[in-house]
């Protein structure tokens, strides 16, 4: 059963940003680069009209309204990415064995984690830069999902299973997302 006759969400396009829609693909170009994403849901129309991105659906059901607002959030994140970018900060924590972290190509190499001989590896997604400064790792990029996934890959590479986490707290942890500290 439809909720309303239609749902329409509008996003203002800021100065210096270009948005183009071709079929189901939304492209956002800005000062930091270009992000492209495919957004498809049956009956949902996305178009640019008078300096605004419009997301529209006729006779929406509850799920359709949720999808329209999700698409709005995705496009807002794309616009924020090409204007400001996204930054995650991770901290290297160890008590006994000093962990060495270095970037090699599209991988982060973690050596001497808990005294292990074999290095652990974490994948860096395309379009993301990783910098290591002492005990801090900075992950930056314009695609929010790629930056978040790269930070998660690094954090998961040092995950400890079958040991008491209250005692063995060594690892690499996300401590800041988009300038906001993460509390544990």
Swiss-Prot record:
Q: Which GO terms describe its cellular component?
A: cytosolic large ribosomal subunit
What function does this protein fulfil? This protein binds to the 23S rRNA, and is important in its secondary structure. It is located near the subunit interface in the base of the L7/L12 stalk, and near the tRNA binding site of the peptidyltransferase center.
Oligomer and partners: Part of the 50S ribosomal subunit.
Q: Which UniProt keywords apply?
A: Ribonucleoprotein, Ribosomal protein, RNA-binding, rRNA-binding
Question: Does the keyword field hold Magnesium?
Answer: no
Q: Which family does it belong to?
A: Belongs to the universal ribosomal protein uL6 family.
Q: Name one GO molecular function term.
A: rRNA binding
Please provide the Gene Ontology terms (biological process) for this protein.
cytoplasmic translation
Q: What is this protein called?
A: Large ribosomal subunit protein uL6
Entry-linked InterPro entries = Ribosomal_uL6-like, Ribosomal_uL6-like_a/b-dom_sf, Ribosomal_uL6_a/b-dom, Ribosomal_uL6_arc, Ribosomal_uL6_CS2
Q: Which residues form a coiled coil?
A: none
């Amino acid at each position: 059963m439809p909720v309303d006759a239609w749902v329409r969400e509008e996003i203002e396009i800021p100065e210096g940003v270009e948005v183009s829609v071709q079929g189901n693909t939304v492209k956002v170009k800005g000062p930091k680069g270009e992000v492209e994403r495919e957004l498809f849901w049956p009956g949902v129309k996305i178009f640019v009209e008078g300096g605004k991105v419009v997301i529209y659906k006729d006779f929406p059901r509850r799920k359709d309204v949720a999808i329209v607002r999700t698409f709005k959030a995705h496009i807002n994140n794309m616009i924020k990415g090409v204007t400001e970018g996204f930054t995650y900060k991770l901290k290297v924590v160890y008590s006994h064995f000093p962990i060495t972290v270095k970037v090699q190509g599209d991988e982060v190499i973690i050596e001497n984690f808990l005294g292990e001989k074999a290095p652990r590896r974490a994948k860096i997604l395309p379009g993301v830069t990783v910098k290591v400064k002492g005990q801090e790792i900075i992950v930056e990029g314009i695609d929010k999902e790629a930056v978040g996934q790269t930070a998660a890959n690094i954090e998961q590479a040092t995950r400890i299973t079958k040991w008491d986490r209250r005692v063995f707290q060594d690892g690499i942890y996300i401590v800041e997302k988009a300038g906001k500290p993460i509390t544990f």
